[in-house]
């Protein structure tokens, strides 16, 4: 039992963080439940599963009352707008496809939220993420490891965690299957036991990110041209933010064969279209790299790397090319390597590290 160890847990009102809070209480921790009030416009307050809608706050409050822990709502709207929403908008305007959940974990949940917890004397922060943290006694390093089920594993979104953060973070449901988590919630009489998983970007209604960016951007969205790989004009596009690498449907123009978005050039406002085989590349450059299982990359290292949340890790070799920049060379070409997405590297179930894809080669 961990009597007198104080932990502040982020509660979204969903089943995962609710059960995580319950498990911590059962283990003897002094648990404080907190819902983070993030930025949301009036028209998206009640997104189904939205993590800071009024209903989500009330769900979290009811769970906290049921398991007998204090509950608070903390306002992170300003920093969330600056570090997540503005970043999200800027990246799309640059022809990239960002992952706002990774930015939120890096800047909000495991930075500002973490600092707030430490300021009030908490020993740990906790979340309902599906991942595990272990200490390697031989090296003294804290390791981030995949959860027991690959289907729900969320290590991809947590690669920015530092050694200090890992030391003071608890992930109570990393050893549980999702079905078991729901069972525990039902056994405890939690109304959230059958609450649907959130599937959308929490601040974007109906997942319509393009119109969200258009509405909130100070920059005018300009039409431009589709071009082929040789630069020949094929037609007009309605603005680069409406397209992503690998896209085939919704181009608004028809050809005699399937055509795919293979590159987006914000400088001259063009979108390059090509064949499916043009999407396959073996190399990429990643920046803002954070390593977890190693301190620095001294020499080429064999890993398994995944280029998006839903991808399977693929064998590759990583090479250092700068202070926080690496080149990844895959054994087999990867389809639709996308600027702005994260690439995360693994050694089996251990997270080696990750970074933001700058370009494919």
Swiss-Prot record:
It is an enzyme of class 2 (transferase). ATP binds at residues 10-17, 36, 128. Coiled coil: none annotated. Disulfide bonds join 104-202. It catalyses: S-sulfanyl-L-cysteinyl-[protein] + uridine(34) in tRNA + AH2 + ATP = 2-thiouridine(34) in tRNA + L-cysteinyl-[protein] + A + AMP + diphosphate + H(+). GO terms for molecular function: ATP binding; tRNA binding; tRNA-uridine 2-sulfurtransferase activity. Its EC number is 2.8.1.13. The record marks 129, 341 as: Interaction with tRNA. The active site is at 104 (nucleophile), 202 (cysteine persulfide intermediate). It is found in: Cytoplasm. InterPro entries: MnmA-like, MnmA-like_C, MnmA-like_central, MnmA-like_central_sf, Rossmann-like_a/b/a_fold. It comes from the Bacteria. GO terms for cellular component: cytoplasm. Belongs to the MnmA/TRMU family. Catalyzes the 2-thiolation of uridine at the wobble position (U34) of tRNA, leading to the formation of s(2)U34. PANTHER family: MITOCHONDRIAL TRNA-SPECIFIC 2-THIOURIDYLASE 1, TRNA 5-METHYLAMINOMETHYL-2-THIOURIDYLATE -METHYLTRANSFERASE. This is tRNA-specific 2-thiouridylase MnmA. It comes from Clostridioides difficile (strain 630) (Peptoclostridium difficile). The gene is mnmA.
